[in-house]
């Protein structure tokens, strides 16, 4: 008799547990009152709900047509990518999500100060691409392309990947429907963006988006790029190398040039022109004139202190300055006033296609 009672109790407990689990699963998938099964975003929203990425806006609603805010989007991203957020209220949790998304590089600084603003499509796509590690390259890097703002490039890629419609624009405000459909897509599908060709032998040891590096290389004069390739040099994005070099030199480095290895090492694209200046110095054979210009004009050149440490750094910084400000008459006039011989020397180099 006791055995029968125990078995009956076990069966009842098993049944109740199964009923609870079934009810919980059913509750998570019942949907939202304002989201019919015929809605184009139904599958996306239900996927996000089932994976606890969205809980709707309360009272059984999802509010698909309401504009999505930075705060709401940040919460969805953090839930989608298992990023821990802290807080005891929606306000605290969502603010934590915004801060975490900023640290991850998914949102910009504006999000921190204005988490309640509505997102435009360009911003939504840029954030989604950053989270999903989908690279975005400037249109100008492709044959026949033109330079576009960040959001316009995101729209271009979004259309190529069919993540937005042909009629969609970068500045239009997006809805919770749009956000749900986009997030569902990047979580469940694989996307490939063809990288533009590099003008030199490029090694991406850091495995980062090379867009900024390719844009920086566009600033280097073509005759120098041709000489770079002809001489067998390599442009290498290598965070580990630069980090180790910084430790050895006890200073913060973002670029370095190894003449023996014929390699420019970088951890930031902004160092491209300076390091290219070192290559130019090497290409010209380190002429004595460079040392003479340094001794005569470096200290009063108006350039940063680092440029005044030796002739090679002075030459590299002058090259950087002349490329960046070459079309700015006021900035070039400042260099001419402070370092007239140097200014004339670089003007002649430019006329001679950066060779002697």
PLM region descriptions:
Residues 198-210:
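Fold-level signature of zinc-dependent metallopeptidase catalytic domains
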Residues 19-198:
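N-terminal propeptides
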Residues 31-32, 53, 212-220:
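Export/targeting segments at the very N-terminus of extracytoplasmic proteins
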Residues 1-27:
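Gram-positive cell-envelope targeting signals
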Residues 13, 52, 60, 260-262:
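Beta-strand-connecting loop/turn residues
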């Amino acid at each position: 008799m006791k055995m029968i009672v125990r078995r009956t109790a076990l069966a009842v407990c098993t049944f109740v547990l199964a009923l609870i689990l079934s009810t919980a699963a059913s509750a998570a998938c019942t949907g939202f009152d304002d989201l019919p099964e015929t809605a184009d975003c139904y599958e996306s929203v239900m996927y996000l709900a089932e994976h606890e990425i969205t809980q709707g806006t309360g009272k059984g609603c999802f509010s698909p047509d309401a504009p999505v805010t930075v705060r709401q989007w940040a919460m969805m991203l953090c839930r989608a990518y298992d990023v821990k957020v802290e807080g005891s209220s929606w306000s605290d949790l969502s603010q934590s999500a915004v801060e975490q998304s900023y640290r991850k590089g998914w949102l910009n600084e504006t999000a921190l100060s204005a988490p309640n603003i509505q997102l435009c499509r360009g911003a939504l796509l840029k954030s989604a691409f950053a989270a999903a590690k989908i690279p975005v390259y400037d249109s100008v890097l492709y044959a026949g392309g033109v330079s576009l703002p960040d959001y316009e490039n995101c729209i271009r890629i979004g259309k190529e990947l069919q993540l937005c419609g042909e009629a969609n624009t970068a500045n239009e405000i997006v809805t919770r429907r749009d956000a749900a459909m986009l997030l569902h897509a990047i979580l469940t599908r694989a996307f490939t963006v063809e990288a533009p060709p590099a003008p030199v032998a490029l090694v991406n040891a850091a495995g980062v988006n090379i867009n900024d590096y390719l844009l920086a290389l566009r600033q280097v004069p073509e005759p120098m790029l041709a000489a770079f390739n002809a001489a067998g040099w390599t442009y290498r994005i290598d965070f580990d190398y630069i980090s180790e070099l910084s430790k050895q030199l006890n200073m913060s480095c973002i670029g370095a040039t190894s003449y023996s290895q014929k390699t420019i090492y970088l951890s930031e694209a902004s160092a491209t022109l300076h390091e290219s200046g070192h290559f130019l110095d090497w290409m010209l054979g380190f002429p004595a004139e460079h040392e003479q210009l340094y001794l005569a004009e470096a200290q009063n050149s108006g350039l940063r202190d680092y440029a005044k440490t030796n002739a090679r750094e002075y030459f590299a910084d002058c090259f950087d300055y002349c490329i960046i400000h070459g079309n700015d008459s006021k900035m070039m006039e400042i260099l001419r006033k402070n370092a007239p011989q140097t200014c004339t020397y670089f003007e002649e180099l430019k006329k001679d296609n950066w060779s002697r």
